[in-house]
From Swiss-Prot:
The gene is ILK. Mg(2+) binds at residue 339. The modification N6-acetyllysine is found at residue 426. This is Scaffold protein ILK. The modification Phosphothreonine is found at residue 173. ATP binds at residues 200, 202-204, 220, 270, 272, 279, 341. It comes from Homo sapiens (Human).
Length: 452
């Protein structure tokens, strides 16, 4: 079968590029052994494919069934250029697999001397023990062993044995490839959905946690008055565009159930354990969003929006705000396609005006530059990330809409905010929509801020 895993193994860059260009393909899916496309390309030394996968957003620290990361495989097989590429993109150099081995264990065992030296030069620990009490240097032949010890000591490493603990990876979440079959089903049998817990209910419908084909999912049941053949046809036509699997910062709609046979039109999407960015910032989840995490979220959102803005035509009726951005298990922010409104859902109503650009509150959608308006929404998200506050929390939606559109109400930037973030916010919130930047222009700015 000439699938993506074979193409990555064989280094067929043209076929891989064509596959990546199809938005319904998920580059972070896994095969039967939990190997992602990146695992295979790293194992087989396919540098061009590795580069392409990383540029398209492949997860660097993804683990297969044996908890090997792509770095474990590249180090074992002595692909020095790929090891350096993975390290450049922040691969976890001391990631532990199911045997307690780190990439350096394998580089030493297989006699990949140069790779072992590179790993130590980048902070790999020479005396971390696996489950069997063996250190990486125990696996190396004598000359390499001495050399690595010497290098590590020069770099300030303590050469005493670090005993194996089952908690080496605690505090990081183990990132698994996604189930590769999920993007194959667009129409879903309503009877196969198992509704577990109701999460939320509002004007547009109900949100449930559920199970489907052994996977945790979120089920969105739409409330639609006077369901008709025409609305049913629109639902069928508009759904497929929301199945975007090809970008790591976009959360696709996995599939839909038409009504009938379902009692209401229904969407399903991946379960996100942390919920939305709104939940994380304002509803006390278990982790702290510090400055570096805030910049990472901003970068994730900017990358996702930059991708969505390349689509022609644009996805209509998509509103960017902190409730429509989901946070994945590995703290990646993803723009949710399940929050896009359908043409038959309350046209002309705004439910989150605090994030909406003034011109979009005043004009019809067809008279607004959507890309510029999205940039304003992004500026409000930046404000929210640095202040941890809900914009205009003391006003009703009606008041916010009126005051932003007609009275010049704007978020006030408090003192003490990083001057870089402050400047970026002001640029993105320019009163003249034509002077706001595009997302592909601010991605490199945020990347620089992240590196600092």
């Amino acid at each position: 079968m000439d699938d993506i895993f074979t193409q990555c193994r064989e280094g067929n860059a043209v076929a891989v590029r064509l596959w990546l260009d199809n938005t319904e393909n998920d580059l972070n899916q896994g095969d039967d052994h939990g190997f992602s496309p990146l695992h295979w390309a790293c194992r087989e030394g396919r540098s061009a494919v590795v580069e392409m996968l990383i540029m398209r957003g492949a997860r660097i620290n993804v683990m297969n069934r044996g908890d090997d990361t792509p770095l474990h495989l590249a180090a074992s097989h002595g692909h020095r250029d790929i090891v350096q590429k993975l390290l450049q993109y922040k691969a976890d150099i001391n990631a532990v697999n199911e045997h307690g081995n780190v990439p350096l264990h394998y580089a030493c065992f297989w006699g990949q001397d140069q790779v072992a030296e590179d790993l130590v030069a980048n902070g790999a620990l020479v005396s971390i023990c696996n489950k069997y009490g063996e250190m990486p240097v125990d696996k190396a032949k004598a000359p390499l062993r001495e050399l690595l010890r010497e290098r590590a000591e020069k770099m300030g490493q303590n050469l005493n044995r670090i005993p194996y603990k089952d908690t080496f990876w605690k505090g990081t979440t183990r990132t698994r490839p996604r189930n590769g079959t999920l993007n194959k089903h667009s129409g879903i049998d309503f009877k196969q959905l198992n509704f577990l817990t109701k999460l939320n209910e509002n004007h547009s419908g109900e949100l449930w946690k559920g199970r489907w084909q052994g996977n945790d999912i979120v089920v969105k049941v739409l409330k639609v008055r006077d369901w008709s053949t025409r609305k049913s046809r629109d639902f069928n036509e508009e759904c497929p565009r929301l199945r975007i699997f090809s970008h790591p910062n976009v959360l696709p709609v996995l599939g839909a159930c038409q009504s009938p046979p379902a009692p209401h039109p229904t969407l399903i999407t991946h379960w996100m354990p942390y919920g939305s960015l709104y939940n994380v910032l304002h509803e006390g989840t278990n982790f702290v969003v510090d400055q570096s995490q805030a910049v990472k979220f901003a970068l994730d959102m900017a990358r996702g929006m930059a991708f969505l803005h390349t689509l022609e035509p644009l996805i209509p009726r998509h509103a960017l705000n902190s409730r429509s951005v989901m946070i994945d298990e590995d703290m990646t922010a993803r723009i949710s396609m399940a929050d896009v409104k359908f043409s038959f859902q309350c046209p002309g109503r705004m439910y989150a005006p605090a994030w909406v650009a003034p011109e979009a509150l005043q004009k019809k959608p067809e008279d607004t530059n959507r890309r510029s308006a999205d940039m304003w929404s992004f500026a409000v998200l930046l404000w929210e990330l640095v202040t941890r506050e809900v914009p205009f929390a003391d006003l009703s939606n009606m008041e916010i809409g009126m005051k932003v559109a007609l009275e010049g109400l704007r978020p006030t930037i408090p003192p003490g905010i990083s001057p870089h973030v402050c400047k970026l916010m002001k640029i993105c919130m320019n009163e003249d929509p034509a002077k706001r930047p595009k997302f592909d222009m601010i991605v490199p700015i945020l990347e620089k801020m992240q590196d600092k």
